[in-house]
């Protein structure tokens, strides 16, 4: 009598590279034993455009339109880091009004990013209603961006030494109205989602990351703060003028998908609180450092000709990056967004290294999904909040 062979073969499934809920093209090669995940291998690079190499062949001003294509849902942060690096390299002072305007734009961009994380994340786990609700606040936000910068997305608003244009007449009142309205929206989301038993069943205890583990993996942003680590670069690095306002670092200690949701939803309310304080105390004065508007160093340069009489509206085409190196970082919605810049007494950076939060946060995904169910992959991946534009660069 022959004994039947009861050996099981694992099933290998491709998720992607196009998944309907993904911002970009990520491919997951998942090994399954029935419904249980045995292994998961992310395949990156489908959206690689050589952003670091492009930077080495452009001046900072020429490169600014490119950076909004990294994380295209939080473009103000990529612009901020791009101008902060040469500002610190050249020791350029930013006027107080410009710094206040920057904080407003950064926090509005943080809210926009979290809103467009919340909708697809809820759709991933089966709740379609919030996906449509978030577009109300998002449309109002984009109207504010359009009025101030001329663009709904890809704003190209930050400049070395300030911002491109002052806030238009009546914009501050509109922004205050938006803050009052969106606070009620955040409360509505919390009522709709946070205590929903089906939602809690899907996210509670799923994808747990301990505090020490989060530090060892190099996680940042809500991924780190949801694991009990109170680390926010706005408090740590004291950049722009965040120290002048009263706000708290939002954190949770559970480290699961629910904790990451709670951190982001409370960060939206905290950002509104910061914006309200900035709008009430915004000072007068210039919106950019006029000393940055330099002409070409060469005598009788073509840049000084009659045809170029308006060139002083822009930072000089010969804005040199001194021969030194530095690392600059900001607290983006997804985590620590950093630039390692090496100058070479040239108008082009010698090296422009991008440290995207999404790329590093994504590395923990295979560990989180092991021994989980197949359906939990989208919950965990959604709670990480990645944009493939900045992951692949």
Swiss-Prot record:
Key words, A-Z: Chloroplast, Membrane, NAD, NADP, Plastid, Plastoquinone, Quinone, Thylakoid, Translocase, Transport
Keyword Thylakoid: yes
Membrane topology: Peripheral membrane protein
GO BP term (any one): photosynthesis, light reaction
Annotated localization: Plastid, Chloroplast thylakoid membrane
EC number: 7.1.1.-
Keyword Lipid biosynthesis: no
One cellular component (GO) term of this entry: chloroplast thylakoid membrane
Cysteine pairings via disulfide bonds: none
Main location group: plastid
Family annotation (SUPFAM superfamilies): HydB/Nqo4-like
Catalytic activity: a plastoquinone + NADH + (n+1) H(+)(in) = a plastoquinol + NAD(+) + n H(+)(out); a plastoquinone + NADPH + (n+1) H(+)(in) = a plastoquinol + NADP(+) + n H(+)(out)
Function in brief: NDH shuttles electrons from NAD(P)H:plastoquinone, via FMN and iron-sulfur (Fe-S) centers, to quinones in the photosynthetic chain and possibly in a chloroplast respiratory chain. The immediate electron acceptor for the enzyme in this species is believed to be plastoquinone. Couples the redox reaction to proton translocation, and thus conserves the redox energy in a proton gradient.
Family: Belongs to the complex I 49 kDa subunit family.
Quaternary structure (record): NDH is composed of at least 16 different subunits, 5 of which are encoded in the nucleus.
Name of the protein: NAD(P)H-quinone oxidoreductase subunit H, chloroplastic
Organism: Liriodendron tulipifera (Tuliptree)
Gene: ndhH
């Amino acid at each position: 009598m022959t004994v039947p062979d009861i050996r099981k073969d694992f099933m290998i499934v491709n998720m992607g590279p196009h998944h309907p809920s993904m911002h970009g093209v990520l491919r997951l090669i998942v090994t399954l034993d029935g419904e249980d995940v045995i292994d998961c291998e992310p395949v990156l690079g489908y959206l690689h455009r050589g952003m670091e190499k492009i930077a080495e062949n452009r001046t900072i001003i020429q490169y600014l339109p490119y950076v909004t294509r990294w994380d295209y849902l939080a473009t103000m942060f990529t612009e901020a880091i791009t101008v902060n690096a040469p500002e610190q390299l050249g020791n350029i002072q930013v006027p107080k009004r410009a710094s206040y305007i920057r904080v407003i734009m950064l926090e509005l961009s943080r809210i926009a990013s979290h809103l467009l994380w919340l909708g697809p994340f809820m759709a991933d786990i089966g709740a379609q209603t919030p996906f449509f609700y978030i577009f109300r606040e998002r449309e109002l936000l984009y109207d504010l961006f359009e009025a101030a910068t001329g663009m709904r997305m890809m704003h190209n608003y930050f400049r070395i030494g300030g911002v491109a244009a002052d806030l238009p007449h009546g914009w501050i009142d509109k922004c205050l109205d938006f803050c009052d309205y969106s606070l009620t929206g955040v409360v509505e989301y919390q009522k709709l989602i946070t205590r929903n038993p089906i939602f809690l069943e899907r996210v509670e205890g799923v994808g747990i990351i301990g505090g020490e583990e989060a530090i060892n993996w190099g996680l940042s942003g809500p991924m780190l703060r949801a694991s009990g680590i109170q680390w926010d670069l706005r408090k740590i690095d004291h950049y722009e003028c965040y120290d002048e306002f009263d706000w708290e670092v939002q954190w949770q200690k559970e480290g699961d998908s629910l904790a990451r949701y709670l951190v982001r939803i409370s960060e939206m309310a905290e950002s509104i609180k910061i914006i309200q304080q900035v709008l009430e105390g915004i000072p007068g004065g210039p919106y950019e450092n006029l000393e940055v508007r330099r002409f070409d160093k060469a005598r009788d340069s073509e840049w000084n000709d009659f045809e170029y009489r308006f060139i002083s509206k822009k930072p000089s085409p010969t804005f040199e990056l001194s021969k030194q190196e530095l690392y600059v970082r900001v607290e983006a919605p997804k985590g620590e967004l950093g630039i390692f810049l090496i100058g070479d007494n040239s108008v082009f950076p010698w090296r422009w290294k991008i440290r995207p939060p999404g790329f590093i946060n994504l590395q923990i995904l295979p560990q989180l999904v092991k021994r989980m169910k197949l359906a939990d992959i989208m919950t965990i991946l959604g709670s990480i909040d990645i944009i493939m534009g900045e992951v692949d660069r």
